[in-house]
């Protein structure tokens, strides 16, 4: 009777736990959405031009002075939109890379995208005189040739070339994760070496413009660049979310995923290509922004688990939150100008990443210590019991 009751109530208990987990996940997602909205609102009021909250509200509804309206609508709003879109895109791309390669150290730049984009931008600025420095203090105070998109276009072309080259090489070895990582490191080193040679022969102005371009700067964003990034990120997000159950199957291993009907090689090729294109677009317009694609997937997986139906939207929201925080910090810490947001994300990300590594090591040591202590205690108890039994029998 007791066994029958246990078998009857056990499925109900599991359903209750699943419902509780689902509600917790929904609560965290709602909290992330609120965080994005609040931080985006705060970012509108932070900047080098000191405006009161009332003046910002007036400019937001186009009731302030012409200069204030121009600052809010032409500078700050495109910047906030870029932070939300780029943060989401880089974070989701990092999550997809980590899933495909089964490597927690993987990032959106694993395929050498950032290195190739930097080379393309340097080639445009140095070799084709694509940029010259202005006398302003802002990080984005240089103009890129006659067409402001020339350098971004060149950066995107070389980033895409790097993606296709690495994925083409990896198809020869059936997309083994180790081969992908090693190929990315090798090709990335080639792009870095080529960039160094270009900078060696550059003029002072060209070198300064090239180095400034590599700084991650949301101040370059315009409504047009935001629209391009939004379209690419949205297409990638929809594709990844539709394929979320296949990514969940991939977590069980290639053999298990294939037994469930997943075309593993095709999934890896398509998803890594799309994740790299998202990264290439963001880097081409905004420069190098590191650690977003590593930190945020780790945070969401620790909070919400590995189910991609939850972790994909959660990673997107957490990436937006991180980049909004970094952008706000860069404008608050800069003396009259914004610091490179890429430097802020690295300063925030490096200690966090080290903390994850050390916590994992300490947790592993603690587990071994507890297991060893339990085995010793078990051995002592067994030996004591044997002595007691032997004493009674004698």
Place the predicted regions along the sequence by residue:
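Alpha-helical transmembrane segments in inner-membrane proteins
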Residues: 2-374, 387, 394
């Amino acid at each position: 009777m007791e066994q029958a009751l246990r078998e009857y109530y056990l499925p109900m208990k599991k359903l209750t736990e699943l419902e509780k987990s689902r509600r917790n996940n929904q609560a965290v997602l709602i909290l992330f959405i609120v965080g994005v909205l609040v931080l985006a609102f705060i970012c509108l009021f932070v900047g080098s031009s000191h405006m009161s909250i009332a003046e910002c509200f007036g400019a937001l509804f186009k009731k302030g002075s012409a200069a204030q309206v121009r600052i809010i609508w032409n500078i700050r709003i495109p910047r906030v939109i870029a932070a939300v879109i780029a943060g989401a895109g880089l974070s989701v791309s990092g999550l997809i890379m980590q899933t495909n390669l089964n490597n927690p150290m993987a990032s959106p730049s694993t395929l050498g995208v950032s290195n190739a984009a930097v080379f393309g931008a340097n080639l445009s600025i140095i070799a084709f005189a694509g940029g010259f420095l202005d006398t302003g203090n802002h990080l984005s105070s240089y103009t890129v040739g006659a067409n402001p998109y020339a350098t971004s276009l060149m950066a995107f072309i070389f980033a895409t070339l790097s993606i296709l080259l690495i994925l083409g090489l990896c198809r020869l070895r059936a997309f083994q994760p180790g081969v992908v990582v090693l190929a990315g490191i090798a090709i990335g080193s080639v792009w870095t070496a080529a960039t160094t040679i270009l900078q060696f022969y550059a003029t002072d102005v060209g070198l300064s413009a090239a180095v400034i371009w590599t700084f991650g700067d949301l101040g370059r964003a315009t409504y047009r660049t935001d629209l391009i990034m939004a379209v690419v990120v949205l297409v990638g997000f929809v594709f990844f979310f539709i394929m979320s159950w296949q990514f969940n199957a991939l977590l069980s291993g290639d053999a298990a995923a294939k037994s469930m009907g997943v075309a593993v090689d095709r999934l890896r090729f398509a998803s890594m290509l799309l994740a790299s294109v998202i990264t290439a677009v963001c880097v081409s317009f905004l420069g190098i922004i590191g650690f977003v694609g590593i930190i945020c997937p780790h945070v969401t997986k620790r909070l919400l688990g590995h189910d991609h139906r939850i972790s994909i939207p959660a990673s997107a929201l957490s990436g937006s939150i991180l980049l909004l925080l970094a952008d706000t910090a860069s404008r608050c810490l800069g003396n009259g100008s914004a610091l490179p947001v890429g430097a802020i994300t690295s300063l925030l990300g490096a200690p966090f990443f080290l903390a994850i590594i050390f916590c994992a090591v300490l947790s592993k040591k603690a587990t071994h210590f507890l297991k060893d202590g339990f085995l010793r205690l078990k051995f002592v108890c067994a030996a004591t019991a044997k002595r007691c039994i032997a004493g009674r029998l004698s």
